[in-house]
Amino acid sequence: EILIGLVGSEMCIRDRSPCYVMDEKLLRKNLSLIKSVADRAGVEIILAFKSFAMWKSFPIFREYIRYTTASSVYEARLAYEEFGSKAHTYSPAYTDTDFPVIMRCSSHITFNSFSQFRRFYPMVEAFGEKITCGIRINPEYSEVEVELYNPCAPGTRFGVTADLLPETLPEGIEGFHCHCHCESSSYELEHTLQHIEEKFASWFPQIKWLNLGGGHLITRKDYD
């Protein structure tokens, strides 16, 4: 059971324990800050279910955040069926069984490789509803200190490096997706953007969007 209200209230604790308890006031404080950053920066901040998927709180989230990101068929369904908007979906690999559901529940689909894109893009074209597709890029830079968790570590299979991108992107690729942060600061984001621009700027005129992935700890006190 999930109860949303003021932590310590008799309603939440005395009569209905065990339960998950969320402090709505603190939640709204964080969401207000996140929305403020999005508005001032001119970006769209989307909710990652990988870190938070308490669906009972979605009505509150929808007041501040419009979209979510998914990494599986069930997260895509959660976005579409419970959050009320189609997901921005990325997965290292899709299956023939899951992909029709992924398409039904997604507005954006990112592929990890061009082989995955070539395999599934004909299904996107035949789907009948607009889905914008992208490719995950690897900037070969990350400040994640634990090598095990570094998606840009040598030998990684996450994303495509600049030397493997064709000069002209395949028809149907409209965006780039990058994920190389974990509880990161704005300074780490700044450094990442510099590397992305250095390696991938020549393709920018060909794309419509850039997804910078998760791991941005915006609510941390020292986040600039």
Give the location of each predicted region:
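Single conserved hydrophobic/aromatic residue that forms the stacking wall/gate
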Residues: E1-G8, C12-I13
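Gly/Ser/Thr-rich beta-alpha loop segments that engage phosphate groups in nucleotides
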Residues: V7, K50, G215-L217
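Short, compositionally biased "basic patch" segments
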Residues: S9-E10, E24-L31, R66-T68
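Glycine-rich phosphate-binding "P-loop"
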Residues: R14-K25, D39-I45, S85
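Active-site-proximal beta-alpha core segment in soluble small-molecule metabolic enzymes
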Residues: V43-I207
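Glycine-rich beta-strand-to-loop/alpha-helix junction loops that act as flexible
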Residues: C180-H181, L210-T219
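Histidine/acidic-residue-rich catalytic or RNA/ligand-binding cores of hydrolases
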Residues: R220-D224
